[in-house]
Each structure stands twice: as C-alpha cells, then as structure tokens.
UniProtKB/Swiss-Prot annotation:
Primary localisation category: mitochondrion
Name the record gives this protein: Iron-sulfur cluster assembly factor IBA57 homolog, mitochondrial
Ranges in a coiled coil: none
SUPFAM superfamilies hit by this protein: Folate-binding domain
Organism: Chaetomium globosum (strain ATCC 6205 / CBS 148.51 / DSM 1962 / NBRC 6347 / NRRL 1970) (Soil fungus)
Gene: CAF17
Location of region: Disordered: 35-56
GO CC annotations, alphabetized: mitochondrial matrix
C-alpha cells in the first residue's frame, strides 16, 4: 500500500487581453503520475516568509472591477448641529485645524468622504463607518448634511444610538432605503488614478454619484455612492461582493461587526490607527482617553492580519506539506473540501505541537483566505517596541485552528486546519513609522 502523499499543482500566470491577469492550472499537473515517498520520509516545509508579496496577483483576486456592497447601508444625518454632533462621537476629525466649539462650513474638511469609527466611552469599537458630505441635499446649507455608511446588519442599531445621544442637538436621522442609495467599491490595479477622473456630471444641481478614495490601504480602490443610477458608468467588470471581500482580506482590512466585533474590538488591534480612521491630534470625542493612551504609552500585542489556511500536516502520513509563501487564493483549503467559511468565528489559534496561551482568534474568511486577530510576538517576526527578538516567534513554527468541536491547540478534538499569518507591507511601514516617534 502506497503511503499517503500530497499533490501540489502548479500555476502559470498569463497576461489576458486588456491587461487583466489570469491564472491557468496545467492539466498535466493534475494527471501526471507522482513518485511515492517512503513511509518514513520526513515532512518538508517550504515558503515560510512572513511578509505579503509586493506585486503578485494571486488566482481568484481580480486586478480590476466594481462590486455593489449589499453588506453596507447609509444613514442620513442632516441639520444645523449635524457636523458638531459627529465631531464629538467619531474618531476622525471633521474640522482639522479648528478646535472651536461651533465650526462653520469653512472649517469642515473638503474631501468627499473619509473613514472613521464610533467608540464606546471605554474606547472599544461600536461601528466602523465611512462618512460623506451629502451633496444631494439642497434644503440645508453646505456642511449641514452627511451620509454615514455602516454595516447593513448594524444600521438600525447605529441609527438608534445616534438618536439616543443627540439630546437637544438640531438634526434629523434617517436610515435610507435600498433604492435611495447604494454603496459600491471600484478598483483598477493597472491604473489606480483613473478612478479620480470618472465622476460623471449630471443635469440637476445635485450629483447622483459620490466618489472618494479608500485610503485604508494603498491602492485599495474607491468608494462610490449612487442614488438614481442602477450601476456606475465605469469601464470595469461588475463583480460579486465576494471579490471585494477577497481584496480586503489580501490587504488585511477588516470591515463590519463580524470582523470588528461590536463593543469588543479595540482601534489599535483593528489597525484603525494605521488606516487613517483616528486623528490623534483631535480632542474631546467619545472613547478618546484609552485610544490616545494606547497610542502614546501602550504596547499593541495583537493586530488583525491576513491569513491563509492550508491542510493540517498531521492528517496524512508522509508526503510534502506546502506551507503558503504568499497570500494566494483558492476556493478551498485543499483538504476534503474544507473552506474558511467552516471555521467558527472567534475560534482559537494554537501553535502546532505546543500548549499554552492562544496565539490568536479567527475572524472571517472565504475559500482559503481570511482575517484573524493575531499575537504579533508569536505568529509574526514583528518586534514590539521596547522588546527584543526571540520573545516568542520561532521561524518554522506552524499554527492550527479548529473547525469546531475542539480548541485550536494541537491534540484538541475535532478537525483542524493550519493557518499562516502575513504582515502586509503597508502595515509594516506604519508600525515602523511609530517607532520613530
């Protein structure tokens, strides 16, 4: 009886028409006979780089496209006190350069939209949001009308939260119906700047589309809001929302309260400090105290990182176990049809062959790609401020997460898959810049 072995297929990158990259899996690789390995052959480990690739375009990750985000909804906040109220409850700065109590339209930031978050008084994330100037509104003066984009499953809760704490502030809050406004995300890796010149002009005095760059990660794309047109008129292929999720996951960007856990996640651990959601020069907003203290005096030991799942090497005897060397995508983990969707949310991550504290917590994923909250000193080579290397990370260590019915620790009950975290270049750069301050 031949020993069990793993078959690794090769991929060939092709340049398709129009500059769109594709991936071809050689049929010969699927049918070519494999030489059996001796039963006693040790498992070989390859590709343990801890950094995401700079220019690779993994299979299944589209280099250009536009996707409607049904997972997001819009809330209208309009009235004389709308800007003042928002300034006091979000992490971003609505009035950069002005610290007075009564901002006017001249003091407001000029960009069409920006990323921010609502926090609890203890500094934990309630909602991650994009906030836009509502330039459709002609019934209020400039700067009195705003649109808040939020996780669709949390939109009603945020609306109630705003109403509860508005007190005597003069503004109205309303959740937009699906037909009133839609959220899209567009990207074009070959020409990222092309989207800045595509905003259409419209016959009425109010535009029916709002566009703004998504600055959470370099060249992540653009956010678009449409109000009367079914689809933005852009020369890009229309893709399902899953394509956008995979793009986020590859860049290490969490979104919504399934990934930024409501009243649990912390801004720094969720990378909000590195994605432009927090203005640390701003004062007097809900949750500021802990957020500022963490920035200047705390050590952030956990961060949300992109992760790749691959088969548990202990499931078969002998063979070659290929440890992912890049954040590449496939529709399953490569073991009995297992996918990232089968990993329970918040499942614990453990180190293979060792017991001890959890190395992280799984958040969400598609196929073999997803996000996890990872302990940096255990799962990555990142050296924390004030510490030296060798505090926990060991080159060659592997990690495992359970599919349910047991913990992620090696030896736990239930099926397991292995997991590897990567630190995106943009996050490494952001962390390095903090060390210089």
């Amino acid at each position: 009886m031949q020993p069990a072995r793993r078959v690794v297929t090769s991929t060939v990158r092709l340049r398709a028409r129009g500059g769109v990259s594709g991936v071809f899996t050689c049929r010969g690789c699927l049918t070519r006979p494999r030489l059996p390995l001796p039963a006693s052959a040790p498992q070989q480990r390859r590709g343990l780089s801890g950094s995401a690739p700079r220019n690779a375009a993994p299979p299944g990750l589209y280099p250009a496209g536009i996707a409607e985000l049904s997972s997001r909804k819009l809330i209208s906040v309009s009235g004389p006190d709308a800007a003042k109220y928002l300034q006091g409850v979000i992490t971003a700065n609505l009035t950069p350069g002005y610290a007075g109590p009564n901002p006017t339209s001249e003091h407001l930031r000029s960009d069409a939209g920006f990323y921010a978050a609502f926090l609890t008084a203890q500094g934990r994330i309630l909602h991650d949001v994009f906030i836009y100037r509502d330039v459709r509104d002609t019934t209020h003066p400039a700067g009195h009308s705003w649109l808040v984009e939020v996780d669709a499953a949390e939109a009603d809760r945020l609306q109630k939260h705003i109403k509860r704490y508005k007190l005597r502030a003069k503004f109205d809050v309303r959740l937009l119906n699906e037909g009133e406004g839609r959220v899209w995300h567009a990207w074009d890796d070959a020409n990222p700047s092309s989207l800045t010149t595509t905003q259409p002009s419209f016959p009425s005095s109010s535009p029916t589309i709002i566009t703004t760059p998504d600055h959470r990660a370099p060249n992540l794309g653009h956010r678009l809001l449409t109000f009367s047109t079914p689809t933005p008129s852009l020369p890009l292929p229309t893709l399902p929302e899953t394509a956008y999720r995979l793009r986020r996951y590859r860049h290490g960007i969490a979104e919504g309260q399934a990934e930024l856990l409501y009243n649990t996640a912390l801004p720094h651990e969720s990378n909000l400090d590195a994605t432009g959601a927090v203005d640390f020069r701003k004062g007097c907003y809900v949750g500021q105290e802990l957020t500022i203290r963490t920035e200047h005096r705390g050590v952030v030991r956990k961060r949300v990182l992109p992760c790749v799942l691959y088969p548990d090497g202990q499931a078969e005897g002998g063979g070659v176990v290929v440890v992912p060397g890049e954040v590449g995508f496939r529709s399953d983990v490569g073991a009995e049809g297992v996918t990232a969707e089968m990993v329970p949310a918040e499942a614990s991550i453990g180190r293979v062959g060792k017991k001890g504290r959890s190395a992280g917590k799984w958040l969400s994923g598609v196929g073999n790609l997803g996000l996890a909250l990872c302990r940096l000193e255990i799962m990555t080579d990142v050296v924390l401020p004030g510490e030296t290397g060798g505090t926990g990370f060991v080159e060659g260590d592997e990690f495992v997460v359970g599919l349910g019915g047991g913990s992620g620790e090696e030896g736990g009950e239930g099926k397991k898959v292995r997991i590897k975290a990567f630190v995106p270049d943009w996050l490494r750069t952001a962390l390095a810049s903090k060390e210089g301050h």
